[in-house]
Amino acid sequence: MSRRGQQPPPQQQQAPPQKNQAGKFNPAEFVKPGLTEEEVLEIKEAFDLFDTDGTQSIDPKELKAAMTSLGFEAKNQTIYQMISDLDTDGSGQIDFAEFLKLMTARISERDSKADIQKVFNLFDSERAGVITLKDLRKVAKELGETMDDSELQEMIDRADSDGDAQVTFEDFYNIMTKKTFA
């Protein structure tokens, strides 16, 4: 009781940050450059779907299922590393804000891979799934580049990981993302 004989007001609990005053999820709170409200809602739906125990957090088993449903291959070691990297409160689980951060990073990675695939397809004129010397010759000519076959072959040799004189998409992706470059 206070000095005037009144009880102090009861402590008010604050709603979780992802809910608005009415207790409804407000995607606008999570929108940022490169991420629309619609995308936030899609990610929230996945989060809710895999938060099977309704705790507003996802444990390692739930995270693996969520990543798989969004089209990502997720190995156990990767899942535990993601949780370790993103679990800012040390709970061993991921809340929605942490999950959103993870998914936006993965979506960005997936989108850039799709863009690189489009560029690869421009080089792969025969749609054979590989870039050959003939393909490079054609692109160089279209771009007005005067390169002899030895220069073009050197480009292929630098990108070709298995020595078959062809550049696969994986080779091309690795070069474009600077994962390998001899």
Swiss-Prot record:
Residues that hold Ca(2+) 1 according to the record: 51, 53, 55, 57, 62
Sequence positions that bind Ca(2+) 2: 87, 89, 91, 93, 98
Cellular localization per UniProt: Cytoplasm, Cytoskeleton
Region (Disordered): 1-31
GO molecular function terms listed in the Swiss-Prot or TrEMBL record: calcium ion binding
Keywords in alphabetical order: Calcium, Cytoplasm, Cytoskeleton, Metal-binding, Repeat
Pfam families tied to this protein: EF-hand_7
DNA damage found in the keyword field: no
Domain called EF-hand: residue spans: 38-73, 74-109, 111-146, 147-182
Record's keyword annotation contains Kinase: no
Main location: cytoplasm
An example Gene Ontology CC term for this record: cytoskeleton
InterPro entries in UniProt: CALM/Myosin/TropC-like, EF-hand-dom_pair, EF_Hand_1_Ca_BS, EF_hand_dom
Highest taxon, organism lineage: Eukaryota
Function, as annotated: Plays a fundamental role in microtubule organizing center structure and function. Component of the infraciliary lattice (ICL) and the ciliary basal bodies.
Note: Binds two moles of calcium per mole of protein.
PANTHER family: EF-HAND SUPERFAMILY PROTEIN, MYOSIN LIGHT CHAIN 1, 3
Sequence similarity: Belongs to the centrin family.
Protein name (Swiss-Prot/TrEMBL): Caltractin ICL1b
Annotated source species: Paramecium tetraurelia
